[in-house]
Amino acid sequence: RTGTWESAGEVLSMMNVYQQKQSATPLLTEKQVSWELFYNKAHLFFWSAMGYMAVGLLLLIFVVGQLLKPGRCLLKTIIIPLVTLVVLIFLLHTSGIGIRWYISGRAPWANAYESMIYVAWATALAGLLFIKRSSMTLALAAFFAGIILFVANLNFMDPEITPLVPVLKSYWLMIHVAVITASYGFFGISFLLGLLTLAFMSAGNPSKVALLQPHIRELRIINEMSLHIGLYLLTAGIFLGAVWANESWGRYWGWDPKETWALITMVVYAFILHARFLPVLRSDYAFSVMSVLGLASVLMTYFGVNYYLSSLHSYGGGDTPPGLTAVFITYACVFALMIYAGYSQRRQ
């Protein structure tokens, strides 16, 4: 034991040079290694989740408070700084995706963890796109993005950066998956807007309902806009996926469970957007209920197929998560809200 490590260091350096030259797969450069160390220590997505949830909840409280008491001028003193914080958190979230992309050398939405990170990003982006029309939409989007990121950071999601399986080594990964998965963010926004509309309709005091009626109409307009964007993205993603399927498997459509449920989701949201032509489904209440229930088809397409059905797309799933107990409990509460909102509408 001489205590000198120079020779060992030289051997390691020679091994590194040899691996860089002879390895069949490209190794990480020194810059990539340093960025990965920073990425692992910074926990960018965890802090983004905490920021989204905290700031989104505060923003929602103050925006709703301003609606109920219009006399208070909270726009410049509180709401604008909170909106600025959401933008900064979104930039932090975006930087995390960019760093992961640089480290892996591929688009970071190839497994369950990465797709959740991307859906959260698309949700926050959807809220920012509607910021000029409604601060409330941004508040809902930020809070929902925080919840998605929080779920992604739970133990059953594996955050490891892994190499792509052969079928995913295609430029279509960046195009098809990005487009079709982004639609889930807009559908999530519509779900939250529908919930908030039902909550406004459940206000027991008729005077408060009358005060909120213009905002209910505004929420419906934004909800329809969000559904239109989501449906456009979903439809484009399905067609792009068909082209990729033809390149990978030699057929455009094979009624694979993922393909089938994506088509079902497209039909569901197309019906929701056209239901206003039916007199019985023309009301704001009916539209809000449908926009809330429609998300169930998205959950089945995204989670159900990946984890509980045999599909050619199951390679994107990763580890199997716990059961859908939380989803069932959530929808039980949602059904209770729907019933109470419908009762309030009839009574008024």
Where are the regions a protein language model picked out?
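Alpha-helical transmembrane segments with an aromatic anchor "belt"
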Residues: 74-75, 215-219
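Membrane-interfacial helical/loop segments at transmembrane boundaries in membrane proteins
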Residues: 166-167, 314-318
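Short clusters of hydrophobic/aromatic residues that line enzyme substrate/ligand-binding pockets
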Residues: 35, 164, 249
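Hydrophobic cores of alpha-helical transmembrane segments in multi-pass integral membrane proteins
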Residues: 16, 44-68, 79-106, 110-162, ...
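Cytosolic-side membrane-insertion boundary helix
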Residues: 26-56
